[in-house]
């Protein structure tokens, strides 16, 4: 990136976003709303006013039952064919590039209004992997994100791996030469950076990532606890002849997936579910699914699951998932001790990601001096943190989950950041 004009560091997240810039040599976070340094990465297209709402107003419109279309977790669509498909929303046909660009433009506008500066240059965080190591969609995902920034009004955009930004912001460890492992568990991906601190900055030894985040935790809880109440796992009578067949899992899996929910609200899907309800051996359950699609309650359910997850994680008394949007007294009890088995598969994947990071650097677990957790999903104490087993000797650190990442994006990456292609032969 050419060195001219101020740079706006942007953490465009799956669930929440933030921005910052360098002021008087120190990172300064932009206030997205009074007292709020983050902006929910959500959209609501109001059918009555024909307006597009972003952030908390979008969330509130959904909670208020305003007629419209809600969207969240669009970062997970980057790199897929859906990004460039035009669809009718309000009075125009738009792509997801257009929609994400509007969100980034709003961040740009708020930053310029607060600072009085013009930001033509952006340094954007990006996950180490969008979809998976070696996935053919990786290059396209970054190209899509770049296109969104350009469409938002930025003239130049560079990218920095999100865990590297957190490593920069974390600065040096207790002693020069110590090794730290950044574990960035975000809404849609989890990234790992192994770095070594020194008097002259931070050296990145290895980066790795897996496509697992907080929205996947929500999805697993939703599928395990909520979808059975809507007919998942039930049987349908065959339309012709005797016998039964299982209800198809695909619709329940999509309904539990944040970024796929809007695509279920079609006449074809509604007709299919109505036919399933007529053939169901448990029609009271399948009729709930009919209601969810007719009244477009998919995101309401997803938020209810998220609230229940947070309550269980925070040690609330009798945590539960309230489903009164469907039926007034419908509730799912969510005991904290039952979350670990539901999330076990994700814990295993995180352990694999951390192990692979160490192997890429040629570093053993015993050489790691500290594990630093960042990212919005990192405070999930009920998720069995595999690093506690992998590196039990390393004290964990939980700085504010967003500030380290965006602070690193606001700081200049050179000369503090260096990537070490081949680890030195004698690591401390």
Question: Each PLM stretch: what is its role?
Answer:
Residues 83-84, 116-117, 231, 235, ...:
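Intrinsically disordered or highly flexible coil/loop and linker segments, enriched in small
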Residues 38, 197-323:
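Phosphate-binding glycine-rich/basic clefts of nucleotide- and phosphate-handling proteins
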Residues 190-197:
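Amphipathic beta-strand/beta-sheet edge segments enriched in Tyr/Trp
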Residues 176-185, 232, 414-428:
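A polyampholytic, Gly/Pro-enriched intrinsically disordered region
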Residues 187-190, 265-275, 374-379:
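Core structural elements
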Residues 75-81, 116-119, 274-281, 313-334:
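Flexible hinge/switch segments at interdomain interfaces of large molecular machines
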Residues 223, 227-232, 389, 393, ...:
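Short, well-ordered loop/turn and helix-capping segments at boundaries between secondary-structure elements
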Residues 1-39, 58-182, 198-214, 330-364, ...:
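N-terminal phosphate-binding loop and flanking beta/alpha elements of the actin-like ATPase fold
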């Amino acid at each position: 990136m050419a060195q001219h004009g101020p740079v706006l560091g942007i953490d465009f997240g799956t669930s929440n976003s933030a921005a910052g810039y360098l002021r008087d040599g120190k990172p300064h976070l932009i206030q997205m709303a009074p007292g709020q340094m983050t902006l929910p990465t959500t959209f609501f297209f109001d059918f009555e006013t024909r307006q597009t709402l972003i952030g908390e107003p979008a969330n509130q419109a959904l909670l208020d039952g305003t007629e419209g279309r809600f969207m969240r977790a669009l970062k997970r669509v980057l790199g897929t064919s859906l990004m460039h498909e035009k669809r009718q929303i309000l009075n125009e046909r738009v792509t997801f590039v257009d929609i994400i660009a509007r969100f980034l433009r709003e961040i740009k506008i708020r930053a310029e209004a607060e600072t009085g500066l013009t930001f033509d240059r952006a340094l954007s965080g990006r996950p180490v992997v969008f979809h998976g190591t070696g996935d053919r969609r990786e290059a396209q995902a970054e190209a899509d994100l770049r296109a969104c920034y350009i469409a938002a009004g930025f003239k130049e955009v560079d990218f920095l791996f999100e865990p590297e930004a957190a490593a920069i912001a974390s600065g040096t460890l207790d002693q020069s030469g110590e090794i730290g492992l950044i574990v960035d568990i975000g809404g849609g991906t989890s990234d790992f950076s192994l770095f070594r601190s020194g008097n002259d900055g931070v050296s990145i030894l290895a980066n790795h990532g897996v496509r697992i985040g907080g929205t996947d935790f929500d999805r697993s809880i939703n599928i395990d606890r909520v979808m059975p109440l809507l007919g998942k796992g039930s049987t349908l009578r065959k339309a012709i002849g005797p016998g039964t067949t299982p209800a198809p899992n695909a619709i329940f899996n999509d309904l539990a997936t944040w970024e796929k929910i809007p695509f279920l609200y079609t006449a074809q899907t509604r007709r299919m579910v109505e036919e399933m309800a007529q053939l169901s051996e448990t029609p009271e359950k399948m009729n709930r699914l009919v209601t969810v699609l007719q009244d477009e309650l998919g995101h309401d359910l997803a938020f209810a699951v998220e609230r229940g997850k947070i309550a269980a994680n925070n040690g609330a008394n009798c945590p539960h998932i309230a489903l009164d949007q469907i039926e007034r007294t419908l509730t799912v009890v969510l005991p904290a001790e039952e979350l670990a088995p539901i999330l076990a598969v994700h814990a295993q994947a995180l352990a694999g990601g951390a192990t692979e990071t160490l192997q890429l650097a040629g570093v053993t677990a015993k050489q790691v001096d500290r594990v630093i957790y960042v990212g919005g999903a990192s405070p999930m104490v009920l998720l069995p943190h595999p690093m506690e087993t992998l590196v039990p000797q390393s004290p964990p650190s939980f700085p504010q989950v967003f500030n380290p990442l965006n602070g690193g994006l606001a700081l200049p990456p050179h000369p503090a950041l260096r990537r070490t292609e081949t680890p030195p032969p004698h690591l401390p």
